[in-house]
Amino acid sequence: KEIQAVLKGMKAKKPGVPKQLAYVEGELFEQYIHDMKIAQRFAELNRQAMMDTIVKGMGFHVEEQFTTIHNYIDVENMILRKGSVSAQAGERLLIPINMRDGSLLCTGKGNEDWNFSAPHGAGRLMSRSAAKEAFTVSEFKKQMEGIYTTSVGRSTLDECPMAYKGMDDIVNNIEPTVTIDAIIKPIYNFKAGEEE
C-alpha cells in the first residue's frame, strides 16, 4: 500500500519532460541504485543456483567459473550497459552467438573508447515477432541437430539460430574490445518458453 500511495503521488506530479527523457537525482537516485544492487545480486544468486543444479545433475566438473551479465548497471563504475557486457582489461567474459553455434570465450581489453565494454551477443537479424512468422519449428529442429535440447518449439521460435546474425558478423567486429580465446560449442541448451 505504501508503494502504491507513493506511485500515485508521483503520477500527480507530472514532470515537465517526456517520460523517456525523465531521470532521477538526489535521494531518489540513491534509492534507485540501492534497489538495483539488490535486484542484480538476487539475479546473480539465481544464476548460480541454476548453474549448480545443472553441474550436479550432469555430473560436470567446473574448471573455471565467472559471470557475464548484460543489460544492467555497473554500479561500481556507474556505467549503464544496454546491449553490452563488461570487458575490463584481463576480465574473462562470454559472448553468446545463438543456441546452435555457442559462445565466444574472451578476455577483455579494457578499451576506454568502448566504455570498457563489448557487445553482449551477435545481435538479431529480425524482431521476435518476425522470426516467429519467418521460420518453422521443423527448420528450428533441423538447425539444432546434435545438441540436446527440450527447448525447440513454437514458444521459443523467436530464439532460433536463424533469427540471429552469424558468428563471423561479431568476430569481425569485436577486435578492439576483446581477445577471443576459444569458441564453446553447446552440448545442452535450455530456453524457457511458454508451456505448449
Task: Give residue ranges: language-model regions.
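Domain-length cofactor-binding catalytic modules of enzymes
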Residues: 1-196
